[in-house]
Each structure stands twice: as structure tokens, then as C-alpha cells.
Amino acid sequence: MRRFSALATIATLTGVALTALATPATAAPNGPKPPSPGDTVPVAEHLVGPLTFDVTPNGTLYIGQDFAGLLTRVSGGASEVLATGPSIAAVSTLGDVVTWGEREGDMEQVFASRLMQRTADGTVTSIDVLAWEEANNPDADAEYGFRDLAPDCLEQIPPFLLPFVGQHGGAIDTHVYGSLMLKDVTYVADAGANAVLAVDSAGNISTVAVLPPSSLIATNELAASFGLPSCVVGHEFITEPVPTDVELGNDGWLYVTSLPGGPEDASLGARGAVYRVNPATGEVQLYASGFAGATGLAVAPNGTVFVAEMFGNQVSVITKRGEVSSFAEVPSPAGVEWERGRLYVSTDVFGDGNIVSIGLR
């Protein structure tokens, strides 16, 4: 993964106000009425980068405080640190087992990437995702960047930018950012590998699907903002997909949020998306788009999908007809989970982070 802005550098944005607003689609007049928010109850406070979390049927929270490197359990008002590590994300649970991801590295390279699991008795296991990525690199044959620039134009691009904007395949990178634990398999949204992975109970990793890239046409504004020569204007730039979360729908398909690569806020438009992925065949379908930072999603039992828009300051809802509208305005949301008829959302993730529970009506 090589891109102007990457999830690996989100921690550097702590304290920065991100106020770019998305303009969501509205539900068709004759379509089903989307849900609206009811009461809002705070369930965890004073968190440091709660980018991902999970909630159990009894209300216990397992929280990845990414910027602090903490995996925290909150139950009955009491908080307990279960694990420490670098860049903790991809938190999910199944019964008394909790899964999370750890990453060591920066925007340029990754030094370690692990999928971790902790059982009820405190036993922790680790799967080396970086070793698998180095051996397999599922998007190695993809084509990203500018693909049709003349040689004299390429020569004008600053050398330090050329690996990011020149034509290139998927680099060796992995960032276990979202996960979903099921009985015999854990699915991973890998924001570095640009793919959805499956990890079986023996720890074997396989590729479910590589998400499709998105594209934009370079404008004068884009060229100026990134220090690119004017000869790139009017050319198509292919950006890498950035899978951020994965959930199972009631139709048996996986639902996956993705950032667009390149600038991941709305500075070049709200380009985040939700995809449907067939876990048996790897087929990928675009389900909805136009999100300003689609970093987390939840699927209700009736098939309604909720999407956290980190840079849009809202949670959006997608009806079963595929119509998108705003569900609730919340500051800098990241994770979103559904449990027992309520929506749980992590908010203010770049400052004094919180998790709230929102009723529906």
C-alpha cells in the first residue's frame, strides 16, 4: 500500500479538527422510511483513539484504544486493560474470545503486523500477517497511480512522490484494521493489503477478495496541493482501496467499508464506499458510495446498514433498497456496532474519545 494518506498515520491527527462534511443521498419518497435516532447514552468515556471496538450481548465493551496502544474491557462501569501493543485495532469478539490487530510501522513501510486472540483464561495467540503478506501480496498485480503519463511528465514529478503517484502495483503492506469473528473463521479487513482475508481456526490465512480501486481526474487544485506538475491535470489517477471494517449480512454476504486511498477525507469529494463480498466466491459488488471516511459499519438483523463517516461527522444509514441518508450527527465517529436493538458508536476519536449507545425509532 502506497498512498498520499494512510490509516497508519491517523494517530498523527490527534487533536486536529476534521470538519469536511459529506452530502448524503436521500431516501426515495416511496422507499422504506429509514430509522431515526432515539435516546443517546454514554457507555465509555475518556478514551484515546477508540477506532474499533465490540460489544457483547450483556453490554461488555472491548475497546481498541489505538493511539494509546491499549485493549480495554469495560463492564459494569469498571475498566480493565487486557493487552498493550502498537496501534491496536480490528477488535471483535465471539463468546469469551477477543480478537484484535497490532501494527508496527509508518506510512512508508511495515515492520510487524499481527492478528491476536485472547481466550477467557488469558491465553494469547499471535498470527504473523506480515509474513503471509510478504509471501502472497494479493494485490501485487493491481495497477494504481497515473497510468498514462508521458515520460517527460514523469520526469517532472518530485522523486519522493513518484513511488506514490507513478504507476505501481500493491506494495508489501498490511494493517489489520477490522475483523469479524465467526465460529470457524475470522474475516479481516486489511487496510494495508487492500483485501479481505479469512483466517481459519488453525491460523491459516487466505484471500477472500481484493477490493476494487477507485479513481479521480487530476485537477489544477489537486496538482498544486500535492506539488505535482501541471502536466498531470486531466489524467486519471487510480487510488488504492482501503478496507476498514467487515460484517456479515443476513443474506450471507460480507459487508465491507473502504476508504478511497489518496486523501481519505472529503477534500477531493466524499469517495468512501461499502462493498458486498461473497465469502464463498470472492465476488465483489459496490453496495453504496459517497461517504466521507467510511471507517466502520454495523448490519442490523433486518439488513439495514449503518456507516460511520469519520470525516463527515455523522453516521449514515443504508436501507435494504440501497438508499443512503444521514442517521445521526456525531463528532468524528470511527467504530459502530449493533447489539440488542441499539447502535453503539465511538466518537471524538481524535480527542477525548467516547462510546455512546443510540436507540432507534
Where are these regions (language model features)?
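Secretory targeting and sorting signals
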Residues: 1-29
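Extracellular beta-propeller repeat domains
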Residues: 27-361
